[in-house]
Amino acid sequence: MRYGEMEVKNFNPEEIEVWPNRNDRHYTIKITLPEFSCLCPRSGYPDYATVYIEYVPSSLVVELKAIKLYINSFRDRHVSHEDSANEIYDLLYKKLSPKELYLKMDFNPRGNVHTIIEIDSKKN
């Protein structure tokens, strides 16, 4: 097993690395992860998506390599579009306690179906 595969395999989402936010001003962090993949829980076919994360930090920010490893940890999991989006949102909200959090997952069409999942803390 190569080192990247080992990092993804051994990644524990509960230990996602966060750093102190050293800035007091209100600002938005936008992260785009265009290589999300998981497996359909029904068929086993691969699903691909671009993940868009926007958040206004409070006291913590997520370390970028950690979020990359977390997203990559889905690639061999059988998980629905809805469950993957909600799991990512819930983990980030729990770990960061941001002032605002918005997550969008834009899945590539498969079988003539295009799915977009959006979760917004301002609407919950």
From Swiss-Prot:
Positions contributing to substrate binding: 62-64, 81-82
Active-site feature positions: 40, 47
Pathway: tRNA modification; tRNA-queuosine biosynthesis
Annotated EC: 1.7.1.13
Keyword Oxidoreductase among UniProt keywords: yes
UniProt keyword annotations, A-Z: Cytoplasm, NADP, Oxidoreductase, Queuosine biosynthesis
Catalysed transformations (reactions): 7-aminomethyl-7-carbaguanine + 2 NADP(+) = 7-cyano-7-deazaguanine + 2 NADPH + 3 H(+)
Annotated InterPro entries: GTP-CH-I_C/QueF, NADPH_dep_7-cyano-7-deazaG_red, QueF, QueF_type1
The keyword Cytoplasm belongs to this UniProt entry's keyword annotation: yes
Subcellular location: Cytoplasm
Main subcellular localisation: cytoplasm
SUPFAM superfamilies from the UniProt entry: Tetrahydrobiopterin biosynthesis enzymes-like
One annotated GO biological process: queuosine biosynthetic process
Function description: Catalyzes the NADPH-dependent reduction of 7-cyano-7-deazaguanine (preQ0) to 7-aminomethyl-7-deazaguanine (preQ1).
Family listed: Belongs to the GTP cyclohydrolase I family. QueF type 1 subfamily.
Record protein name field: NADPH-dependent 7-cyano-7-deazaguanine reductase
